[in-house]
Structures are given as C-alpha cells and as structure tokens.
C-alpha cells in the first residue's frame, strides 16, 4: 500500500502538549498520514516545540492541519491586535528567533479541509451550510489571513456578532461569523444562532443543541472530523469524529483513522499530564 492510499489519522487538540504528541507518533504507523484538527498551541507547556514539530511534519508532506481558535488568537497577538491572557502559554513562540517564520506558516494554514470524502474543521459547521459552502467561506477567511493586510483584518475579526448566519451577510461580518463557526461553535439553535458561553457537554442552553444534532443539518451524511469540545470527549458516530479528549487538562491525546466506513476508524490514545486545571479555568 502506498502512502497516498493509506487513510490518514486525525489527531485531536494538542494545545502545546509536545510530549504526548511524540508518544502518540511512536504508537502510529511510521508512514501514516496525519491530520491535525487545530488548536496546535496554547495552554500546554511547550507551544513552541509543538508548533515546530507540526510544521516539520507538514512540510515533510506527511501532515496537514486546520486552524483552531487558539491558533488564530496567537496570530492576533503576534499582529499586536490582542493581548496575552493570564493562562496563555505563547511567550516561547513570540520570543523565538524564528517567530516571524512560524507565524507566516501558521497564517497560511486552512480553516477547513475536504479530502477522500471527509471534512475536517476545528469546531463545527452551521446547519444551513453544505460542504461546498464550508470550503467557500473558509477560503474567504484564508485569503485574508494570507494577504499583506492580515494584521488589519485581524483587528476586526473578533467578537460574537453576528451570531446567526444569513446569506445576506457581507464583508467583515461574514468573515467574523465564519471564523466563529469553524473555530468556536459548540451549541446553536435549529436555525443556526450560535452560543459561545457554554462549554459543558450536558449544559445546552434553552433552545440550543450541539451543532451536529441540529435536525436537517445539510452536512449530515458527510463524515466530519473536529476537535474543540473537551468536555464532550471522544465522539464516534457514522458521520462524526470528535477528537478533543482534553490532553491539556490531563486527559488523553487521541488519534483515529479517517475511514469512510466507521468500522475502520481505529482509535489510538496516549495519556497526558495535566498542564491546566479545568476548574481554575472556569473561575
């Protein structure tokens, strides 16, 4: 079997946890293609080492990655439009001699990947979107991040509004909503209004459901690999592969084979030392 014909393994949120990544890599087949679901950096003890390792894997042709909310936060801090939070662990990247090169690489990564029938995003997709819509909307954001005016773009890219999709949205509102859906979404209403405050898997606000449980979701039937939701943990359904199993919180780092047939989705997990206290995070 050639490398190109081997199904990739999708890997959950790293968040700067390099040691578990190294352990996981030794447990995977040496030639297995890798797909990272985003949040490569932040909150863990070695954001710099983690990012450099992922870049090495990607530039070597073995891996691909999508951007998560923590990755975009790093871009904004590097651009000077956001400040570090008290639990951020990004100083090692920002102070690295190759910081500019690392940021350049990061801002050229996609927000969505569709290959071999599998869609991959960091957080979720809105129920009104088709797979084609996801790729088109993600592409518009990607062009801004890769452009010479990327710092100016990020100045206006943050905020919770608009929270509801409309095909009439234009400009920065359309781009901001796209970023929020692809990198922050957990719960939404059946008509696609997003809610960003609730993280507990069993704590759905009134009128809201997990994005993947919305009746009539237009991507239903297309397998989607995602991360972002550590309190929900491993999600294994015919058309869902949720891989954030809380490595940075002392959970596990998870890889799963991305096969269209659910029976082929072998799961490999390694234990992680706790780098952040989830209870302190909620205070």
Curated annotation (Swiss-Prot):
Q: Which GO terms describe its molecular function?
A: bis(5'-nucleosyl)-tetraphosphatase (symmetrical) activity
> Is this entry keyworded Transport?
no
Signal sequence span per UniProt?
A: none
Mention any Pfam family matching this sequence. Answer: Metallophos
- Its domain of life reads Bacteria
Q: What is its EC number?
A: 3.6.1.41
InterPro entries to which the protein is assigned, alphabetical: ApaH (IPR004617), Calcineurin-like_PHP_ApaH (IPR004843), Metallo-depent_PP-like (IPR029052)
Query: What does the UniProt keyword field contain?
Result: Hydrolase
Q: What does the record give as the reaction this protein catalyses? A: P(1),P(4)-bis(5'-adenosyl) tetraphosphate + H2O = 2 ADP + 2 H(+)
The record ties this protein, via HAMAP family, to: ApaH
- State the function annotated in the UniProt record: Hydrolyzes diadenosine 5',5'''-P1,P4-tetraphosphate to yield ADP.
**What PANTHER family does UniProt report for this protein, alphabetically?**
CYTOCHROME C5, PTHR40942
- Family affiliation: Belongs to the Ap4A hydrolase family.
This protein's name? Bis(5'-nucleosyl)-tetraphosphatase, symmetrical
């Amino acid at each position: 079997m050639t490398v190109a014909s081997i199904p990739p393994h999708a890997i959950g949120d790293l968040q700067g946890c390099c040691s578990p990544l190294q352990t996981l890599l030794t447990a995977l087949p040496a030639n297995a293609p890798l797909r990272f679901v985003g949040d490569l950096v932040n909150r863990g003890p070695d954001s710099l080492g983690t990012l450099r390792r992922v870049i090495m894997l990607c530039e070597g042709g073995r891996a691909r990655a999508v951007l998560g909310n923590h990755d975009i936060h790093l871009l904004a801090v590097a651009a000077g439009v956001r400040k570090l939070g008290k639990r951020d662990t990004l100083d090692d990247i920002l102070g690295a001699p190759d910081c500019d090169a690392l940021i350049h690489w990061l801002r050229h990564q996609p927000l969505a990947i569709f290959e071999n029938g599998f869609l991959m995003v960091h957080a979720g997709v809105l129920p009104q979107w088709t797979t084609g819509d996801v790729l088109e909307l993600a592409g518009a954001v990607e062009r801004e991040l890769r452009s010479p005016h990327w710092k100016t773009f990020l100045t206006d890219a943050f905020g919770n509004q608009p929270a509801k999709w409309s095909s009439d949205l234009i400009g920065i509102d359309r781009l901001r909503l796209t970023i929020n859906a692809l990198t922050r979404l957990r719960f939404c209403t059946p008509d696609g209004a997003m809610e960003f405050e609730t993280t507990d898997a069993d704590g759905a606000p009134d009128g809201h459901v997990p994005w993947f449980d919305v009746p009539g979701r237009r991507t239903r039937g297309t397998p989607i690999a995602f991360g972002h939701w550590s309190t929900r943990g491993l999600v294994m359904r015919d058309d869902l592969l949720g891989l954030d199993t809380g490595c940075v919180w002392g959970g596990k780092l998870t890889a799963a084979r991305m096969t269209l047939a659910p029976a082929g989705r072998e799961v490999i997990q390694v234990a992680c030392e706790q780098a952040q206290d989830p209870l302190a995070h909620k205070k």
